[in-house]
């Protein structure tokens, strides 16, 4: 995605731009002006997860989270995300402070940069003057868009991980964890995994489905009759959910009753897409659940493409479809003014100018400090039932086309 940004306009408004030879690179102030155009574009592309974790900020150095388990000291801490060639920020080992069911945690810090090294600078210097500005313009615009997109993906990863697992877990072998640190925050989500021994796509020797998806959710709703905090109101599914419904023999009976379409018999059959939609509509009406389909993908560090919500999994929302918490940005050092340290919150983009050093380089650094924070815990026992996780099928991938290798979607 390329965002049309004219860096030259920003440069023209600044009296003394950074320069080396005939090259002109933007300053932090100019970068921030250019970023405003990108930020507006990203704000118009709200993701589904933003609905459940609206952004917030605080200057507190720690966030209070409600937990049911004490975390070991060695589990605290997480590497700062960065690309090869960028400098890692120092990591502070901190013991979790536990008071009954509450705990405070230092926010996670993420940082990476786009670096123009000496080789690239020399290459740009060999370009004609009328070409240099256009090339630098294009590289800066693409880098800003790329860095901001990666920050949004990191935020999405944190929030989806909380909603899928009830915790944030960074393993030493994580491809984004070059320092090999281990980080675990358990949010104490009560019984997050719903039991389903036999999946919706399981069938017996006669080809009959083992579980009725509609009845399964109707039973969940009935069991929550006297526990409104546990009543399902919606589900968030990845790709393939409608395929599983269409192949479930229990759902096929509903379709046969309403539409007269009999699977496997010599009758007029609708296209597969029409049948899938009919099965999904029937599921919605008979369960009363809102079905949110989220089939977006991201590319992992190793080049593989993954779904944010893995195939065969879904998230059950209880009580309402409103926010389940906030994504809180915490303070970071934003520079110095009149000899005093300046603090700010939210994502940041700054310039690191070392064009006069040996070897020279120029970098745009992007990052943020923050964590998801849940709300809606029971005030008496700190139980939390706003969302649950369900593994509903084993063979959904067979319905989907394989991802081409190392393709960014």
UniProtKB/Swiss-Prot annotation:
Subcellular location: Virion; Host cytoplasm
Gene Ontology CC: host cell cytoplasm; T=7 icosahedral viral capsid
Name of a matching Pfam family: Phage_cap_E
Keyword RNA-binding belongs to the record: no
Record keywords, A-Z: Capsid protein, Host cytoplasm, T=7 icosahedral capsid protein, Virion
Main location per the UniProt record: virion
Presence of the UniProt keyword Metal-binding in the record: no
Subunit note: Homomultimer. Interacts with the portal protein. Interacts with the decoration protein.
Main function: Assembles to form an icosahedric capsid shell with a T=7 symmetry although with a diameter of about 82 nm, which is a larger volume than the usual T=7 capsids. A dramatic reconfiguration of the capsid shell that expands the procaspid from a diameter of 66 nm to a supersized capsid of 82 nm, allows packaging of the large viral DNA genome. The capsid decoration protein binds the expanded capsid and stabilizes it.
Family classification: Belongs to the lambda phage major capsid protein family.
UniProt protein name: Major capsid protein
């Amino acid at each position: 995605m390329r965002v049309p940004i004219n860096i030259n306009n920003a440069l023209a408004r600044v009296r003394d731009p950074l320069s080396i030879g005939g090259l002109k690179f933007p300053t932090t102030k100019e970068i921030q002006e250019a970023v405003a155009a990108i930020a507006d574009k990203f704000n118009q592309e709200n993701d589904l997860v933003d609905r459940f974790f609206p952004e917030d900020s605080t200057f507190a150095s720690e966030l209070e989270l409600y937990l049911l388990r004490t975390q070991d000291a060695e589990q605290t801490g997480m590497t700062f995300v960065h690309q090869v060639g960028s400098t890692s920020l120092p990591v502070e080992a901190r013991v979790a402070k536990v008071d009954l069911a509450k705990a405070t945690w230092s926010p996670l810090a993420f940082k990476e940069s786009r670096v123009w090294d000496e080789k690239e600078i020399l290459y740009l210097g060999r370009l004609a003057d009328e070409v240099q500005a256009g090339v630098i313009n294009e590289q800066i615009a693409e880098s800003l868009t790329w860095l901001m997109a990666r920050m949004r993906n990191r935020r999405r990863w944190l929030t989806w991980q909380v909603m899928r697992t009830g915790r944030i877990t960074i393993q030493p072998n994580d491809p984004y964890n070059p320092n090999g640190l281990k980080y675990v925050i358990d949010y104490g989500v009560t019984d997050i995994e719903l039991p389903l021994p036999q999946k919706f796509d399981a069938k017996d020797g006669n080809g009959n489905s083992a579980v009725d998806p509609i009845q399964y959710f109707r039973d969940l709703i009935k069991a929550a009759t006297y526990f409104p905090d546990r009543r399902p109101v919606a589900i968030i599914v990845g790709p393939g959910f409608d395929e599983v419904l269409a192949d479930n023999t229990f759902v096929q009976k509903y379709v046969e009753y309403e539409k007269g379409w009999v699977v496997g018999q010599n009758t007029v059959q609708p296209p597969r897409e029409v049948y899938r939609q009919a099965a999904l509509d029937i599921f919605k009406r008979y369960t009363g659940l809102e079905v949110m389909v989220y089939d977006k993908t991201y590319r992992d560090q190793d080049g593989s493409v993954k779904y944010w919500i893995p195939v065969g999994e879904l998230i059950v929302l209880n009580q309402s479809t409103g926010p389940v918490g906030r994504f809180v940005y915490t303070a970071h050092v934003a520079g110095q003014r009149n000899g005093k340290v300046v603090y700010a919150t939210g994502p940041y983009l700054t310039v690191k100018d070392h064009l006069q050093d040996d070897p020279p380089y120029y970098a745009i650094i992007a990052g943020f400090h923050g964590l998801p924070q849940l709300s809606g815990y029971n005030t008496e026992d700190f139980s939390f039932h706003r969302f649950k996780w369900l593994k509903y099928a084993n063979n959904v991938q067979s319905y989907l086309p394989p991802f081409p290798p190392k393709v960014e979607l």
